Curated annotation (Swiss-Prot):
Its cofactor is Mg(2+). Its EC number is 2.7.4.6. Keywords: ATP-binding, Cytoplasm, Kinase, Magnesium, Metal-binding, Nucleotide metabolism, Nucleotide-binding, Phosphoprotein, Transferase. This is Nucleoside diphosphate kinase.
Length: 140
């Protein structure tokens, strides 16, 4: 078991519905610590860079529009096997297929507005964290 970090975004649907505290409670109840957190308005350039892996996908434009439609909360989470743990806590991308007790089952409205993003690997977590945080921003 390795102590590691992962990156999280509470998406505009979460901030719009004022459920960020409830989502954070689920994260912390799962044993993950929030060691970096900031509420920002993602720019178009930030969203396009962050989601560039999806650039050729048909939903890319809608995704960028959604992610820039309101404030988001970017986070650094830390804990034992944080990447896998947070992916488990988030639940399936489609909230209708997410397990009971997961963030997406409890809070997500649709596949497009599914409340949270989490890194899919430790390597990607490092890249994603570096896009929004410096080492000085993280209080471990």
């Amino acid at each position: 078991m390795a102590n590691e970090r992962t990156f999280s975004i509470l998406k505009p649907d979460a901030t719009r519905r004022n459920i960020t505290g409830a989502v954070n409670a689920v994260i912390e109840a799962a044993g993950l610590r929030i060691v970096g957190q900031r509420r920002i308005r993602m720019t178009r350039a930030q969203a396009e860079k962050f989601y560039e892996v999806h650039k050729e996908r048909p939903f890319f434009g809608e995704l960028v529009e959604f992610m820039t439609s309101g404030p988001v909360v970017v986070q650094v989470l830390e804990g034992e096997n944080a990447v896998a743990k947070y992916r488990e806590v988030m639940g399936a991308t489609n909230p209708a297929q997410a397990a009971d007790g997961t963030i997406r089952k409890q809070f997500a409205e649709s596949v497009g507005e599914n409340t949270v993003h989490g890194s899919d690997s430790a390597d990607n977590a490092k890249i994603e964290i570096a896009q929004f945080f410096t080492d000085a921003d993280i209080a471990a």
